[in-house]
Amino acid sequence: MLYLKKALLIVQNNISFNDKAGATRGLHAEPWNKFISTANGRVFGAWCDLRKGDSFGTVFTHEINPGTAIFVPKGVANGYQTLDDNIAYTYLVDAHWSPDAKYTFVNLFDPALGINWPISQEQAIISEKDAAHPLLTNVIPMEV
């Protein structure tokens, strides 16, 4: 059970469809809170705190399935790797997407993060954009 100090108003439900196991996305820190889960199948989730403060760079990982939901606060980078084919990855957010939104990114495969992705970097399906994210040492912490 999740208890929040203040109400979280969900304004948008997003779904990302990934047809192949090994699709690897992230790590993106956004200026909104979100709940993430899957409608079907399994993903390996990874999060890195990119907020300014003592927890900057802290990493958490967990396997997610339709029975699991994770709350990701604004400023914590979110990433995932599909472990099954035909995954619908869902995320509820408390702010609408905007082209003016400020994001912070960190590289999925930065050794400093110590993320043990189940599917290797060589076998993972990664966008050029995600592969080009900076290493943690070059990330400017996000003000939230």
Regions from the language model: what does each represent?
Residues M1-I64, D84-N86, V93-V144:
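Non-catalytic, conserved peripheral segments adjacent to functional cores
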Residues E63-D85:
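Conserved metal-binding segment of the jelly-roll/cupin
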